[in-house]
Regions:
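Transmembrane alpha-helices and adjacent helix-loop boundaries
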Residues: 1-147
């Protein structure tokens, strides 16, 4: 009995860390799609975020596990772990994207103007000025979502 519990606990930790590893950067990619000036991409990403945040995680996991079989006849019985990681990562990426969006939008416009006056381009402004402040702002929300 104890051996089964430790095996399950180990699997849970692996799922947790892999989900975190994939969903944190994917959330930033989703955020960039969400705020894209290319409207079709922005609409698609907004729909993705709404669907992922608006449906239960268990339903999404069932979709990722059983969906390929019922849609394309693919048997993925040996890929249970992959379906879990994929489903959890895509779900949490949507949540992290919204957390990042709220943190980045909370940065005052004066920060961007000051960076422009100092001669920074957009990527330098984001990575050297905005992102360090955003990390401090979003850390409590990200920690809450991780727990």
């Amino acid at each position: 009995m104890l051996q089964q519990l430790t095996t399950g606990f180990g699997s849970t930790l692996v799922i947790f860390f892999l989900t975190l590893l994939f969903s944190l950067p994917l959330g930033m990619v989703v955020y960039f799609g969400r705020v894209s000036r290319f409207k079709p991409l922005s609409w698609i990403v907004k729909a993705y975020i709404s669907i992922m945040r608006g449906t239960p995680l268990m339903l999404q996991l069932l979709l990722w596990y059983f969906g390929p079989f019922y849609l394309w006849g693919m048997n993925i019985g040996g890929y249970k772990f992959t379906a879990i990681i994929l489903g959890c990562s895509l779900n949490y990426a949507a949540y992290f994207a919204e957390i990042y969006r709220s943190g980045i939008e909370s940065i005052p416009s004066g920060q961007y103007e000051a960076a422009q006056l100092l001669g920074y381009n957009k990527s330098q402004t984001f990575f050297k000025i905005v992102l360090p402040q955003v990390v401090k702002i979003v850390l409590p929300s990200v920690t809450n979502e991780v727990i």
